[in-house]
Amino acid sequence: MKRTLKVSFFILCLLPLFLGSKAEQCGSQAGGAVCPNGLCCSKFGFCGSTDPYCGDGCQSQCKSSPTPTIPTPSTGGGDVGRLVPSSLFDQMLKYRNDGRCAGHGFYTYDAFIAAARSFNGFGTTGDDNTKKKELAAFLAQTSHETTGGWPTAPDGPYAWGYCFVSEQNTQEVYCSPKDWPCAPGKKYYGRGPIQLTHNYNYGLAGQAIKEDLINNPDLLSTNPTVSFKTAIWFWMTPQANKPSSHDVITGRWTPSAADSSAGRVPGYGVITNIINGGIECGHGQDNRVDDRVGFYKRYCQIFGVDPGGNLDCNNQRSFA
């Protein structure tokens, strides 16, 4: 059993935003360009929605202008438990507590429900079919990130989601201290359902859920509610020129002209592009994409909803 992908691959696509290894995106450094999706333009010419971008020196679309709202925990999300009772959760993630899974016993139903109810709109947007599709999509993408399945696994490879808590290579530090610090001796490798990676993602997620994840990154592998919260935060939050996965699956995202020309059309495939498009998308068939689709189809079948079209990103250019 081996987890096939980790979010660190996706983060490679975001490194230009944080490390400055790519040409500036906006402002005087980019010929007066304005950031997409209402993002702030920092004094250094990069797009974002947090204080380093919208605060001192911000060049355009600053705090007085509309910017994307980064979700913070609230008391919303009333009926996720109605749509996903514990019996259904156990059916979907059938082997998560199997002794052959390194993370057995960690991902509890109660932790998922508590985290889900902390974010307004998650699993509660639209009609019941839309809500179920979002929950199926979230559980499918995170199941792929934590999969312990193999082709001949009991009940098939798509019954083995949520098998791992931490990535298998725990030697990498993943510290890029330009915008967020790194605590001495701490590592920011992939942890949790979305395999959150890099200190700046730990910092942003911790800021949103009010936990000090810079100094306590291991909370993602010791506290299942915190772990689920970081995954849902990632799901609900737009990234630079990328929409949130939540907006895509609930039909709230409208592709721009650039998206359309890149083949990025509404559907589950765009979510894979958001998460790991620089690695998996745009070069034809990819086994990792197929695995994500396989989980999604299984979960949609369990929910009794149509998965819809545009499930892969084989012919989509990445957002990067």
Swiss-Prot record:
Gene Ontology molecular function terms on file: chitin binding; endochitinase activity
EC number, UniProt record: 3.2.1.14
Stated induction or repression of this protein's expression: By fungal infection.
Keyword Transferase: no
Disulfide bonds, paired cysteine numbers: 26-41, 35-47, 40-54, 58-62, 101-163, 175-182, 281-313
SUPFAM superfamilies, sorted: Lysozyme-like, Plant lectins/antimicrobial peptides
Occurrences of domain Chitin-binding type-1 (ranges): 24-64
PANTHER family: BASIC ENDOCHITINASE B, CHITINASE-RELATED
Sequence similarity: Belongs to the glycosyl hydrolase 19 family. Chitinase class I subfamily.
Role of this protein: Defense against chitin-containing fungal pathogens.
Protein's name in the database: Endochitinase
